[in-house]
Regions:
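Glycine-rich phosphate/diphosphate-binding loops that line cofactor/substrate pockets in enzymes
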Residues: 21-36, 62, 142-145
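Glycine/threonine-rich flexible loop motifs
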Residues: 48, 159-164
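N-terminal amphipathic/basic leader segments beginning at the initiator methionine
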Residues: 1-18
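An acidic, phosphate/nucleotide-engaging active-site surface
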Residues: 78-161
Length: 164
């Protein structure tokens, strides 16, 4: 189900953003589940304090856990002061209220769990023959502790990877 709207001449109001999130989140089957939301770090611009507050208001009453993983890419971990600014609420000892806020530790091999390999033949097909090697699929092992993952963030052109 697609939910949303946009304008060429103005931003969404906070009320419009809240209504869109309400409509999108109410259909998710997350009641009683553990939910991890992957959010961008401080290098991506978006109204994260607004969005964080709406996730807390709209999902926290329905779930047994609502936590956040900051997608750092290869950036440095964010301090609690930086995390507090990012989410618009105090983050103390890795928590904002009842929610945990985790930095993705891309620089620590123990962070990852291997989920498999995309075979070279499939990579070759996807890339039109430009690349033909196995690609390991490794994700933050934290995701294994949750029933539902949500990815939240803007999409921007990126000077290295095309889009981020």
């Amino acid at each position: 189900m697609a939910v949303g709207k946009g304008f060429a001449n103005r931003y969404l109001t906070n009320d419009e953003a809240a209504q869109i999130m309400r409509e999108g989140l109410e259909s998710l089957a997350v009641d009683g589940k553990r939910v991890l939301i992957i959010i961008p770090d401080g290098t991506r611009t978006m109204p994260m304090p607004l969005v964080f507050g709406l996730f807390e208001d709209l999902l926290a009453p329905r779930v047994t856990a609502l936590d956040y993983l900051v997608a750092l890419g290869t950036h440095q971990p964010m301090s609690e002061a930086q995390l507090s600014k990012l989410v618009g609420r105090p983050v103390t000892d890795g928590q904002a209220g009842k929610s945990h806020v985790f930095n993705h530790r891309w620089d620590d091999p123990a962070t990852f769990v291997s989920l498999g390999v995309i075979p070279a033949s499939e990579i070759s097909e996807i890339t039109g023959g430009l690349m033909a090697q196995d690609v390991p699929v490794r994700l933050n092992r934290l995701i294994l502790d949750y029933d539902q993952l949500l990815i939240c963030g803007p999409v921007f052109p990126h000077e290295v990877v095309g889009f981020s």
